[in-house]
Structure formats: structure tokens, C-alpha cells
Swiss-Prot record:
Known function: NAD-dependent L-serine dehydrogenase that catalyzes the oxidation of L-serine and methyl-L-serine and is possibly involved in serine catabolism. Has low activity toward beta-hydroxyisobutyrate.
Active site per database record: 171
Protein name per its UniProtKB record: NAD-dependent L-serine dehydrogenase
Assigned keywords, A-Z: Branched-chain amino acid catabolism, NAD, Nucleotide-binding, Oxidoreductase
Cross-referenced PROSITE patterns: 3_HYDROXYISOBUT_DH
InterPro entries hit by this protein: 3-OH-isobutyrate_DH-rel_CS, 6-PGluconate_DH-like_C_sf, 6PGD_dom2, 6PGDH_NADP-bd, HIBADH, HIBADH-like_NADP-bd, HIBADH-related, NAD(P)-bd_dom_sf
Catalytic reaction(s) noted: L-serine + NAD(+) = aminoacetaldehyde + CO2 + NADH
GO molecular function list: 3-hydroxyisobutyrate dehydrogenase activity; NAD binding; NADP binding; oxidoreductase activity, acting on the CH-OH group of donors, NAD or NADP as acceptor
Subunit organization: Homotetramer, dimer of dimers.
Recorded consequence of changing residue 122 to A: Strongly reduced activity
Length: 298
């Protein structure tokens, strides 16, 4: 049975690690938050004293951290993990980071004889808990096949996006589109209600018409339209607005690097930055509804 080092047990990492335990894998886990470690230990994992300790004897290293600087620090610092992971180890980096950062870590890992994949995920905390995540994978196809059983223990859809960094490119493209669709849905909902339509009726009309999209299907931003959506619990839980702003920033970095025109992505980033200034950083990203009707969700 493979020994897995899992580093980063936040809202996404913890349920992903739990599903690996359920699949029978042996886990050595580390997080800076002790309560997160304790929860995994209670589920059957072993606790490491440090990230460096976690990777000792590991066949696979999985990391799930907040941002590029954390991931680069973990692997590339003077005493970073790449200096302590045994050659031949498979490294799965599942955080959402800049494609340039992913490529930098890929190159450093390859120099040390490590097989690495950038494998950001989509599906949110619910998908992480249910084991239905989508993995967007960048890197060597042979390494992906070795990692496939692990991905299948945590997710439902596994896509090989392309070479080093391609998983991260796919992720920022997806999340930019998600933000634009959510903003458009929120704007349309506010317009219709302001002109006398009942919110649930309007939502159903649009859902079944050419404007239909994921937000209208399962994540409507108008409170009360969908009982289980974050909008109906004061925008708590879900995918925080500050994380969407981070991902939109990564998309803009990629756009600048490739001289791509992304006016909608740029506007979306401006709107989410405005939400952060208004104090909604830790609310679900569907809280963008408040920019179009500030009375909603109060």
C-alpha cells in the first residue's frame, strides 16, 4: 500500500485526505493548524511534526495550499521539500497557483528526479467531501496514469490538460468564466426582480432558456431561490470571495504573459476586489449579488 504525505488540511485538503484514508491509503499528514491534523488523526492518519517529516519514506506527496507563495516556499526554499523528497517519488500539487509558479516547481522537481503533476481541482468543498472533484492535470502523461487511482479516490473527472503548468491554465480559465457567469446571473436576477418579477419564477425561466448556466442550475445567488445554495444561508460556506479574487488575479497574470485580451475577466476582478473592500472577503463568491441589490442577504 502506498505511503502518502499530505500537506495542507484546509477546507479542501482535509476532505480530500479523508477520502484517501477511506480508500485504504496510509497517510502521514501535516498542517500548521493542529486541530486540522487532529481531525485526520482521528480518522486514521499519522501526524507528522513538520512538512519535512511528512515526506520521509513517502511514495507520493500531495500538497493543497492557499497561494503561489506558499507552494513555492514549501518546495523551493533553501530547505524546501524538494531537497528532502526521495528521487522517484510522485508529487501531486493540487493548489491553485500561477502557471509560471507551477512550471518553476516542475523544472526544479525534474532536476531532482521527481515526477510532478500540477493538478488543481474544481468542485468546491462539497465536491471534496463527496469525492466528486474534477482534476485538471498538467505534466507527463505516464505520471498521470500512476496517479490516476489516487485522483479517482478523491474525484470523478480527471483531465490531462497538457504539459507542465497546463492544469493551472485550465483552472484559471474555468474560474474566470465561472466568475463572469455568476456576475451576469446576479445582474439579471436584480434587474428582473426590480421590474416586478418573482425571483424563483425568473430563475426558472432563465434556467430553461438560452441564458441557462451552472449558477442557475445549482448555485443561484439570489437568497431563497435555492434552499441549499450559500445565498440562502447569508452567503456562508462555499467558495470565498477572496479566493475568487485571487484566481481572477492569476487569470489576469496569465493574460498579460500571453498578451491575451480579457476585458470581462478584468471587470470581474475589479468587482470582486470591490466586494473585498466592502467586507465580504470570507462570504461565498455568490455574494456578488449585493453589488446589484445591496438589500439582498441582509
Amino acid at each position: 500500500m502506498k505511503q502518502i504525505a499530505f500537506i495542507g488540511l484546509g477546507h479542501m485538503g482535509a476532505p480530500m485526505a479523508t477520502n484517501l484514508l477511506k480508500a485504504g491509503y496510509l497517510l502521514n499528514v501535516f498542517d500548521l493548524v493542529q486541530s486540522a491534523v487532529d481531525g485526520l488523526v482521528a480518522a486514521g492518519a499519522s501526524a507528522a511534526r513538520s512538512a519535512r517529516d511528512a515526506v520521509q519514506g513517502a511514495d507520493v506527496v500531495i500538497s493543497m495550499l492557499p497561494a503561489s507563495q506558499h507552494v513555492e516556499g514549501l518546495y523551493l526554499d533553501d530547505d524546501g521539500l524538494l531537497a528532502h523528497i526521495a528521487p522517484g517519488t510522485l508529487v501531486l500539487e493540487c493548489s491553485t497557483i500561477a502557471p509560471t509558479s507551477a512550471r518553476k516547481i516542475h523544472a526544479a522537481a525534474r532536476e531532482r528526479g521527481l515526477a510532478m503533476l500540477d493538478a488543481p481541482v474544481s468542485g468546491g468543498t462539497a465536491g471534496a467531501a463527496a469525492g466528486t472533484l474534477t482534476f485538471m492535470v498538467g505534466g507527463d502523461a505516464e505520471a498521470l496514469e500512476k496517479a490516476r487511482p489516487l485522483f479517482e479516490a478523491m474525484g470523478r473527472n480527471i483531465f490531462h490538460a497538457g504539459p507542465d503548468g497546463a492544469g493551472q491554465v485550465a483552472k484559471v480559465c474555468n474560474n474566470q468564466l465561472l466568475a463572469v457567469l455568476m456576475i451576469g446571473t446576479a445582474e439579471a436576477m436584480a434587474l428582473g426582480v426590480a421590474n416586478g418579477l418573482e425571483a424563483k419564477v425568473l430563475a426558472e425561466i432563465m434556467r430553461r432558456s438560452s441564458g441557462g448556466n451552472w449558477a442557475l442550475e445549482v448555485y443561484n445567488p439570489w437568497p431563497g431561490v435555492m434552499e441549499n445554495a450559500p445565498a440562502s444561508r447569508d452567503y456562508s460556506g462555499g467558495f470565498m470571495a477572496q479566493l475568487m479574487a485571487k484566481d481572477l488575479g492569476l487569470a489576469q497574470e496569465a493574460a498579460q504573459a500571453s498578451a491575451s485580451s480579457t476585458p470581462m475577466g478584468s471587470l470581474a476582478l475589479s468587482l470582486y476586489r470591490l466586494l473585498l473592500k466592502q467586507g465580504y472577503a470570507e462570504r461565498d463568491f455568490s455574494v456578488v449579488q449585493k453589488l446589484f441589490d445591496p438589500t439582498q442577504g441582509q
